[in-house]
Structure formats: C-alpha cells, structure tokens
C-alpha cells in the first residue's frame, strides 16, 4: 500500500516539477534578458497587466458561477421523502452520496473549473484594456455617430470583450444551474407546482432575462460596427446599413429588453404562452429586421439607383481611406514628359546618371555568394540598397552583411563546442556601387574581403556580427577557448577573437547554468568545463525575433537593412502601427485599414542593443503605445546624425500606399464609382514572367529642386493598359523625409510604360538577334529590373542585361539597354548606350570651378605640349565615360575644350 502511494506521489510530483521548471526557466531567462537589453519595465508592464486581467477574469467567472450555484442550494430537494421502500433510484442515490458538505465542495470545484476553462477569453486582452485607459484622440469624428476615430480603435474593442465575457458567463450559469434544478427539482423549474412561489423558476428566468438584456447591448455594439460594414459598393456604412440595418438593430435592442421583462414576469405569472410569444416575436423580428428588410432595401431601393443612394457614403469612404493610408498627404504635380534631352542637359544631371542602379539584386545575390562568401559557412541573407558619401560624393550602393550560417558548417565541425562557443559570429560586409562594373562583368567591390578592407574609405572598426538575420541559436562567449574570427590564407589558418561587447547574460553561477539548461533543454550547459566566471550567453540573436520579443505590438518589415555608421554595423528595421478598426477605410490585402511607419528600430550588430525611435509623433497609435510603455520610444532627434543619414522610406509601405492609390487618387465620387480613371502599378518582365514592379531607390534631382536627393519611386499605368500615367516618389533625405509626391503625365499624350519598352526591346532587331545568339550558345540571358528614370522633365528607361553560363552560377553584367522616346540602344555600358542615343559631340557641362591646368590657363607652352595634353584629357574622358562617371567626364571635356581653344590661338599666331 505504501509503495503504491509512493508511486502515485512520484507520478504527481515529477511531472509537476518538470512543468514548473520549464515555466520557471522561461520566466527567469526572459527576466534576465529584458534586464540586459534595458527593457525590464516593458516586461513588467506586460506581465503585471496580463496577470491582472487574467486573474480578474478568473475571479469574475468564479464568483458569478459560485454565487449562482449557492442560490440553487436552498431550492434543491436533497432530503428524500419518508418511506424508504417508496424511494426511486434517484432518491436513493441522493441519500447515499449527496451531503451538504460534498455539494459545497462540488460547487467550488465546478466554479473554479468553469473559471479556468473560460479564462483564455482574456488572453492578450490586457493591451485592449491598456489602450482603453490611455487612448489618444485622432481629432477626427466619424460621419455616422459623430464619435472620434479613437473610440472605434481603442474603446469599442473593450466593449466587445466585455460583451463576450458577459454572454459567456450568463450562458454558462444558465446551463449549470439549469442542470442542477432539472436533476434535483424539475417540477419547480418547469413551473408545474401552481400556487407556489418557485425559487428555481425565478432564478432561471432572471438569468435568461439577463441574457436578453446583454444581447440588447450587443445589438448596440453591432450598430456601432456598421462604420466597418462591407455591404455596399465601398467599405463603411452604406445606404442599406443606415436606413435599414441601423434602425433594425435599435428596434431589436428594445425587443430584447421586452423579452427579458416578459421572462421575468413569467416567473411570477407562469404564462408560458406569453414567454413563447415573446421569444417567437424576437426571432421573427431578427429575421425581418436583419435579413429581410435590408435585402429588400438593397434590391429595390439601392440597386436601381445605386450611385444616387451611395454617393454620400462613397465620399466618406474616399476621405477616410485617404487619411488612413496617408494618401491625403501626397502633393500632386504635373510632369511634362518632354522630348528635348541633349548631351548638355544630361551632363547637368551627372549625379542622377552616376547613380542609376544597374545591378539587379537577384543576380547580384549569386555574385556575392560566389565572390565574397569566401568560406562555405558564410552567407549573405539578401542585398540591401542605400546611399553613402564616398570620396566626397554621394553614391548609391548595394551591400550585404557576411553572416555565419551554422547550418553550413561541415558535418565534422558541427560539435557542441564549435556551434556554441567557437563559431559565434559573422564578419564584415560586402559593398559595390550600384552603377559600376568591372571589365569581366562583375561588381566593383569597394568594401569586402577577409579581413575587412575598403578601397573607398569606408571605416568599420567593429566588423563582427553577433546579431543578424541568420543568428538563430544561442552562443556562449567568454569561455576558456577563444572564438573563431575569420580565416586567412592557408587551409587551416584563422584568426581568433574574444567578445568584448555589452550583449549577453552572465552565466557565471551554478544556479544560472541550471536555469539555462532547462530553458534550452541542453544538459551540456551544466556539464561543460569550457565556461568561466566571465562567460555570457547570447540568445534571441535573430533581429526579427529580438524586436518582437520586446515589442510584439508593432508590425515589422520583413527586410531589415544593414547600415555602416560611426565605424560600427547596425541593422535598421521599419516598424508599423496598424489597425483594422478605422471607420470607413478600405482594408487592404493584409486585412488592416490603417498604417503608419511611426517607428524605426536600430539594432547594434555587435552589442545587440535595441533602440526604438519615434519618427512620426503625430500617430495616435504610436502615442498610445508610448503612454502604455513610458520610455520605450526615443525621439527622432536622439538618433545619431550618422544613422539619420540612412533613414529610408520603406518599400513595403510605398507598395501598400501605391496599391490603394490606384483607386483612391480619384476624389470625384462619380469617377470613383465608375472606376473611369483607375490605375495599376506598372508591370515589368522578370525572367519570363510578367509582374508588378517593386518600388526602387534612385538618386536624382526632383523637378524644381536644386540638388539631387535619394528617393523611392514607383510608376503607374491606367488599369488594363500599358502606357504610363504617373509616378509616385517618396523623399528620404533630411527634413524632407517621408514627403510623398505624385507626378502625373499630360492627359493628351501617351507615355511609354515599362511593358511597352520591354516589348520594344524584344522587337528591336539587333538586340533581339544578340539575345537569341547568346541563348543559342549556352548562356542564360537574365534581364534585370527595368528602371524608369525621370530626368530634366523627360524619361529614360534603363535595363541591364546579365549573362550566365550554364555551367556557372556567376552572372555577368554584359549589356545595358537604354530607351528614350523612339530610340533604343544596347551597349557594353550605360555611358555607351547613352552615347549611341545622344551622340558624342556635346558641349561642355556646367561644372564647379576647378584649379586651372597650365594649358587651360594660357600659360606658356608649345603646340606639341598642348596636343599631348589634349590626348591625355581625351583618354581620361573616355575612361570615365566607360566607368559611368559622368561628372568626371564633363570635367575632362571642359578642360579639353580649353586646351583646344589654346591650340587654336597658337595656330592662329
């Protein structure tokens, strides 16, 4: 007997201990980690709020169920009648097993079980409560109820939550109390004992009446939800919703109240016909007011005169959708699409031409992998695009972080020591200008290699990457053995290092080693002799996981980008505030109908520090989060200047806005209703597939501006057509960051769209023959992104052509196609293609003053020296032309012009 009890205790204690250890280790390691990253207050706010709401919900359900069960106690017939020989089986069982004490325990257990079963209704609802308490007004009222938009986003969700709790609690109480009454006192529950006050019937009727009263409130909530109705021609309350469904919900609310009163009255009058009539009336009213009448109004009033009926609500939808997606902030300008580009005007736009992105990220990823991974265990997750000031000039570059991918370690090297303590970090980055190419068709790397080296003066004092996109598992630093840093010449030669950063949690006591062993299910953390008092464990190292762990209430961009600033490597991650509760705003394909890029997250690749910068302080959702989590967001002004230079408008956000703009650029309700001026995002060919263009960055001078700036742009075409109608630009630099500009083409002209240019490239005989010839000789032709480049009021179209041999995974940039108006040219370089289209006899460009050369200033020199100088300047100009250096090309031509003038004077003498 004792042995059985021992086994029973072990079966209870051991699983209980394991569950407690698992939960406790997760809590403690999260507690340590939040302290390490400096966000323990965020952790406490979340924890205490979640626990408080969950305990409050459990207490509510427990008390509600328990009090209702206690009320049944006096009404249950637990004492069987005298005359044991006449007892039924039920009466015998009650006498044998049911006592007052046992019933009390049963009530407690049932109430607790019900509370625990229904407590998950509160999961994650703590944020709903906090947002209700700390709501920030939008300063904009909806046109139907006149309530501020913040009511629908921050207040209404809490009311829906409370409604669900109340309905669940009352239904649960009805079922449980009804069961006890039916088992122990069915006659009084059913009102069969006339002339006698029926306590069970009154209790049960009160609960059912309460259910109807709560449902009356539910109808009011459903009425408020009409501002997000999808019934009409546009999102939001439509004519039918307002003139049929809204009155229907209001009437149903009063019908529900009346039914509740009838049911309470029935407990005393016991008129089942009245109750039946009330319930049937409620059901009939629901069918009539929620289904039949709205359907009839829609069919017979709205559809025959749809625009006239829906016109006011279309206007609401247009206005609120434009506000919700920030489309109302777009400045609209005309773009003339001139056809008067000349070599001289091109030279004035040297900064634009010097930064046209020729390298498509898709083939470039393969090139980076082949040329810069260097060892099999390194990987480039993806290629980022940014701008840097290099050698005194702003250049658009492609770059990627060289991360260590432990999954690519050789099998023999995949030991616990190697994965956790030796191969701990990536190293450096690779970078190439977006517009230059070597003679072999490869990118011109201006930064890269191992150890890190930059030919462009890019300074990186700390190239090690402990936190990145491929850093999935934990690692331990400060062990007895040094860490692998990077390989050097020779098969087994490498450099070692020791982590000196601020990241990581100390794991210097047996207790902590035990906690982390449970947390990561890894007994070797307890057994290893490689740990020292200086050892630290680095976890949550994947930057996406890291930021979501701190603040999961923002939506994060899927594509972080690497930034070099102040000699260190940082990750930038765009964070969005979104909601699907914005009234009258059309939802997008992601299910939300409001979005702002209010927060920029910066992660130090070495230390793992995470900073949240609020770049749109006017966003009420971000303001509300800032109130809930004081100190979480830093003002944009606190961001170091070196990081602010790399702020980018997110391509994902521009894509969402552009998709909404295809319809919501039309503010005229008649145009919108008929979709007469609907647009599409311009398409291009990628491989052999036709797909919508992605937004792309470029350095260019916007119309009316004096300096080139970094912009993100995307062209539009009319719906179901291929000619271009407009392009959208987002500014990225300095005080202009976030400004949106929409440039529309003249309505009376047809402007070539990207797909038309793609077709013209295919139809151009020389280009088509050359591409076919390469294909026939075993080379795969890869056509890169077709870029539309606005310049001097005109449009250039540029498409790079890559070749990849069948046996090679190394694409080469071999040709560049340029289209302008009716001309198309393909050449080895962008400069060469421009030369074919615009010719070579061009006047010297306007340039900033340069120190005059001896020949250029007319100082003493004979004719032969001037000829040599002219040849030298011409050769340099051609070299710069091949490199795509238009600014340098223009400078050389100006000097050459001065030398030629000097030669003319010498000849005249």
UniProtKB/Swiss-Prot annotation:
It comes from the Bacteria. Keywords: Cell membrane, Membrane, Transmembrane, Transmembrane helix. One of its GO terms (cellular component) is extracellular region. Coiled coil: none annotated. It is a multi-pass membrane protein. The chain crosses the membrane at residues 8-28, 51-71, 103-123, 165-185, 201-221, 245-265, 277-297. The keyword Cytoplasm does not apply. Residues 843-862 are annotated as: Disordered. It is found in: Cell membrane. Its main location: membrane. Belongs to the UPF0182 family. This is UPF0182 protein Moth_1139.
């Amino acid at each position: 007997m004792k042995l059985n009890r021992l086994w029973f205790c072990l079966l209870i204690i051991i699983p209980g201990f394991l569950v407690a250890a698992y939960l406790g280790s997760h809590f403690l390691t999260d507690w340590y980690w939040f302290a390490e990253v400096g966000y323990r207050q965020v952790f406490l706010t979340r924890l205490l709020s979640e626990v408080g709401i969950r305990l409050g919900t459990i207490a509510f359900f427990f008390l509600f169920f328990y009090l209702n069960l206690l009320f049944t106690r006096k009404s249950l017939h637990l004492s069987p009648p005298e005359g044991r020989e006449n007892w039924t089986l039920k009466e015998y069982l009650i006498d044998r097993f049911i006592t007052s004490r046992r019933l009390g325990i049963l009530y407690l257990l049932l109430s607790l079980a019900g509370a625990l079963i229904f407590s998950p209704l509160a999961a994650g609802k703590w944020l709903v409560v906090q947002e209700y308490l700390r709501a920030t007004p939008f300063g904009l009222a909806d046109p139907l109820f006149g309530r501020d938009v913040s009511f629908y986003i921050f207040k209404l969700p809490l009311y829906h939550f409370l409604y669900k709790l109340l309905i669940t609690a009352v239904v649960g109480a009805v079922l449980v109390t009804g069961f006890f009454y039916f088992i122990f006192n069915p006659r009084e529950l059913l009102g069969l004992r006339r002339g006698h006050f029926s306590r069970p019937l009154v209790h049960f009727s009160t609960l059912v009446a309460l259910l109807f009263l709560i449902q009356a409130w539910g109808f009011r909530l459903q009425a408020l939800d009409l501002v997000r109705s999808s019934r009409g021609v546009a999102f939001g309350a439509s004519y039918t919703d307002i003139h049929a469904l809204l009155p229907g919900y209001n009437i149903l609310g009063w019908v529900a109240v009346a039914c509740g009163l009838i049911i309470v009255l029935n407990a005393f009058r016991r008129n089942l016909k009245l109750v039946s009539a009330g319930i049937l009336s409620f059901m009939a009213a629901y069918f009539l007011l929620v289904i039949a009448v709205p359907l009839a109004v829609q069919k017979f009033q709205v559809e025959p005169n749809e625009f006239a009926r829906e016109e006011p609500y279309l206007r609401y939808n247009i206005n609120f959708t434009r506000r919700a997606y920030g489309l109302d902030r777009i400045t609209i300008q005309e773009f003339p699409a001139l056809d008067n580009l000349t070599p001289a005007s091109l030279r004035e736009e040297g900064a634009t031409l010097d930064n046209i992105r020729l390298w498509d990220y898709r083939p470039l990823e393969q090139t980076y992998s082949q040329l810069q991974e260097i060892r099999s265990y390194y990987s480039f997750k993806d290629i980022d695009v940014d701008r840097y000031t290099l050698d005194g000039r702003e250049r658009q570059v492609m770059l990627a972080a060289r991360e260590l991918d432990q999954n690519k370690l050789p099998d023999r090297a995949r030991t616990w020591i190697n994965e956790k303590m030796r191969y701990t970090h990536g190293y450096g980055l690779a970078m190439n200008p977006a517009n230059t190419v070597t003679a072999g068709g490869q990118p011109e790397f201006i930064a890269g290699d191992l150890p890190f080296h930059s030919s462009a003066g890019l300074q990186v004092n700390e190239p090690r990457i402990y936190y990145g996109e491929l850093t999935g598992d934990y690692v331990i630093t400060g062990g007895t053995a040094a860490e692998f840093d990077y390989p050097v010449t020779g098969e087994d030669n490498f450099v070692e290092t020791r982590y000196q950063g601020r990241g990581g949690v100390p794991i210097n006591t047996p207790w902590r080693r035990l906690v982390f062993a449970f947390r990561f299910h890894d007994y070797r953390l307890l057994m290893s002799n490689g740990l020292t008092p200086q050892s630290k464990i680095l976890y949550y190292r994947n930057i996406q996981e890291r930021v979501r762990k701190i603040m999961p209430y923002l939506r994060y961009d899927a594509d972080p980008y690497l930034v070099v600033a102040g000699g260190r490597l940082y990750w930038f991650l765009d964070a969005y505030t979104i909601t699907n509760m914005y009234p009258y705003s059309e939802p997008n394909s992601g299910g939300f109908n409001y979005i702002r890029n209010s927060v920029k997250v910066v992660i130090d690749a070495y230390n793992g520090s995470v900073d949240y910068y609020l770049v749109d302080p006017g966003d009420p959702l971000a303001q509300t989060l800032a109130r809930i989590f004081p100190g979480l967001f830093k003002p944009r002004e606190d961001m170091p200047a070196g990081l602010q230079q790399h702020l980018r408008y997110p391509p994902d956000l521009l894509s969402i806005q552009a998709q909404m703009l295809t319809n919501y650029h039309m503010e005229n309700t008649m145009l919108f209703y008929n979709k007469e001026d609907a647009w599409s995002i311009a398409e291009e060919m990628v491989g052999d597939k036709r797909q919508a263009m992605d937004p792309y960055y470029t350095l260019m001078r916007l119309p009316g501006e004096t300096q080139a700036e970094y912009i993100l742009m995307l062209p539009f075409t009319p719906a179901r057509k291929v000619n271009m109608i407009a392009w959208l630009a987002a500014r990225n630099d300095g005080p202009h960051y976030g400004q949106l500009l929409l440039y529309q083409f003249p309505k009376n002209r047809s402007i070539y769209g990207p797909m038309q240019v793609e077709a013209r490239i295919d139809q151009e005989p020389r280009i088509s023959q050359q591409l076919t010839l390469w294909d026939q000789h075993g080379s795969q032709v890869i056509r890169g992104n077709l870029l539309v480049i606005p310049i001097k009021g005109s449009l250039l179209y540029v498409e790079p052509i890559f070749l990849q041999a069948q046996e090679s995974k190394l694409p080469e940039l071999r040709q560049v196609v340029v289209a302008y108006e009716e001309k198309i040219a393909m050449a080895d370089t962008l400069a060469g293609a421009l030369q074919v289209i615009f010719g070579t006899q061009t006047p010297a460009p306007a340039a900033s003053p340069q120190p005059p050369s001896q020949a250029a200033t007319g100082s003493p020199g004979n004719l032969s020296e001037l000829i040599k100088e002219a040849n030298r300047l011409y050769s340099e100009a051609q070299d710069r032309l091949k490199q795509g250096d238009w600014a340098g090309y223009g400078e050389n031509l100006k000097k050459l012009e001065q030398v030629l003038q000097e030669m003319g004077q010498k000849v005249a003498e």
